[in-house]
Amino acid sequence: MSERLMAGRLNEKNIGEKVLLKGWVQKRRDLGGLIFIDLRDKSGLIQVVFNPDHSKKALETAENIRSEYVIEINGTVVARDEATINPSMKTGKIEVNASSVQILNKAKTPPFTIQDETDVSEDVRLKYRYLDLRRNSLQETFRLRHQTTQSIRNYLNDKDFLEMETPILTKSTPEGARDYLVPSRVHPGEFYALPQSPQLFKQLIMMGGFERYYQIARCFRDEDLRADRQPEFTQIDIETSFLTSDEIMDMTEHMMKKVMKEVKDIDISLPLPRMPYQEAMDRYGSDKPDTRFDLELIHVSDIVASSGFKVFSQAVDNGGKVALLNIKGKADNYSRKDIDKLTEYVKVYDAKGLAWLKADESELKGPIAKFLSEEEVAGIRDRANVEQGDLLLFVADKTNVVYDSLGALRLYLGKELGLIDESKFHFLWVTDWPLLEYDEGLGRYFAAHHPFTSAIEEDLDKLETDPASVRANAYDLVLNGFELGGGSIRIHQKEQQDQMFKVLGFSEEEARSQFGFLLDALEYGAPPHGGIALGLDRIIMLLAGRSNLRDTILFPKTASASDLMTAAPSGVSDDQLQELSIQLQSGEKNQ
């Protein structure tokens, strides 16, 4: 029996060989007496010729073959005539003369053509995901995903890490996003939660003495979705004992250097740049800045603190900021109507408006110019390095609104003006995060990362007296404006964990109820430990040049957390609900 060969791997060295091929019919062309088929398998395409001079029977069978039929071909590899060479195909210099063909399975006419360029809606593609996955671009994406995970595994295995599995059915905790809950049949009225991350288990693994753990972990979060979020996702989960934050960052960036070289053949320089959180916010208005282009925020609060333009001076008086973007040389590119569109854009981020000025040779012109003194104009010109033709866009508001709106506007303009080199990969560590965030509505602090993150040692004494100023021993890895993931050195002493829970507003009873197992473990010689978790789906999205996370997940959910292919979520039977001691409220759906 002949060994099957892969269609896309045939080349001129195979000319004259008899081959066995199996795959799908990409395209069929009947030229009257001759039939041509593009045969597709996971390796690519090859043209197969059915010619009565080689086999009448094969030609007769081919007359009944249609797109996406699964077929088996026996034939001979031959060189194409010079005039029929197809430079757009990897196998375009050869073809296979069929001596026999067998139809292994027929196919209905697909709801869309199986090719990379398709204008079919994403909903249709997701409903027929098994057909969508046949497209070459998705095949390439999932090969890249496999290569990436293999590269990561090989690196960590060589560094003496153990790949270990943590529970999927676990305990619901109050911090973070909403949990997906799983009702217990054995314990009526009680619920498991699907893990948002293996955070506590990997810390317990360190307390178990393994020292180096990793997992390609499935995680679940019941949160509002967007282009770079999914309810179930995969993260590269890593935890170590006895390493400092610098050592963990060094190890992680060497791992990413290996991935970039092996998967993309790109060399990245180490060490990766680092930037404190506050600097990232001040310069880019973002804690995950895209550093592939400049266009940084320019702060002018001190210059306009006493301005006659009350929007500016009142923002400063109220403890806010005034900052601007200088769009170099683009004043003539933006009409009032265009600027109005930009104003509507920043309002999405709670900005009240967008003030603007245009620079000519001698002055700044615009609706707010008459309210600014000569000293203020001179100060703005100097601070923003204003030149003829520049467009200045200001936001004056609460500090977080200024950062959010100008940070988002910066990215919008970067894309609109073609300032971003899409071929570049810019990594960045963001460090010195705030340990806590204050929620004015609830009147309490929340952990900026999670409640198990340790403070930088020199800030520990301020945890109860000035919690807002305490910095976390935490670090996020950013690539091209996307957070790949983050990590921290964990709290390993019970007294500090108790103190952290107290600052977060937990009573002793609440802390014991939710995290008693962790507090107990901390009393039995927990080692200093820390780690990191990187989003695998997001890494693949960026390496594959995808704009949508769904294209990196085999069977993703829609923006409404639905699976259009299987129709999940779905109702269940009354018997199933009764077994789980669950009764639906009136008006809720079931089967």
Swiss-Prot record:
State a single Gene Ontology molecular function. nucleic acid binding
Q: Where is this region: Aspartate?
A: 199-202
- Reactions performed catalytically: tRNA(Asp) + L-aspartate + ATP = L-aspartyl-tRNA(Asp) + AMP + diphosphate
Per UniProt, L-aspartate binds at: E175, R221, H449, R490
Superkingdom assignment: Bacteria
Q: Known SUPFAM superfamilies for this protein?
A: Class II aaRS and biotin synthetases, GAD domain-like, Nucleic acid-binding proteins
What protein name does the entry list? Aspartate--tRNA ligase
Q: Which organism is it from?
A: Oceanobacillus iheyensis (strain DSM 14371 / CIP 107618 / JCM 11309 / KCTC 3954 / HTE831)
* The encoding gene: aspS
